[in-house]
Regions:
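Acidic, His- and aromatic-enriched active-site or binding-groove loops in soluble protein domains
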Residues: 122-144
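A structure-centric signal for secondary-structure junctions around beta-strands
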Residues: 3-4, 67, 102, 148
Length: 150
């Protein structure tokens, strides 16, 4: 059997179903991995504060990979262990490149997510209903995304 030391689990639509529930089978598998000494790490586009309590309350879950992979957070302390921010100029270039496509744009800055009003409106029409309360509570709407990045 391979020596597995870490399991990183996507949350939305994978560990959690569209109703934000974890199946009994998935919980059992996570607990079995933790009991074997495997580090189980939630991996998510969310910021650390948006990881559902059901996952955080599992003894042995110590870290989270957040902000679409740009940050690793120690859950007990909230301390950032790894931060991989974009260079400011590159962030501006990426924003300018994706804005014309009209998708949902969220920019993470110091653990918070920011988006413009048009992006916030698109979230309302595209987000799974069970996820909307989290998205509404965790996103900050700003009138000017380039200025937000400056």
């Amino acid at each position: 059997m391979p020596d597995i030391r870490l399991i990183a689990l996507d949350l939305d639509g994978t560990v959690f179903d569209d109703e934000k529930r974890i199946s009994a089978r998935t919980l059992q598998a996570i607990r079995a991995a933790l009991d074997r000494g495997v580090d189980v790490v939630p991996a998510t586009g969310r910021q650390a504060g948006g990881i559902p309590a059901e996952f955080l309350q599992m003894p042995g879950v110590r870290y989270a990979l957040t902000a679409n992979g740009a940050s690793v957070v120690e859950l007990a302390s909230g301390r950032s262990v790894v931060r991989l921010p974009f260079d400011d100029a590159l962030a501006q270039q990426v924003l300018a490149a994706v804005q014309p496509f009209g998708g949902v744009i969220g920019v993470f800055i110091d653990g918070a997510c920011y988006g413009d009003p048009a992006s916030a409106a698109r979230v309302e029409s595209t987000c799974p209903p069970a996820l909307l309360p989290y998205v509404r509570a965790s996103r900050h709407v700003v009138p000017d995304m380039p200025a937000c990045l400056a």
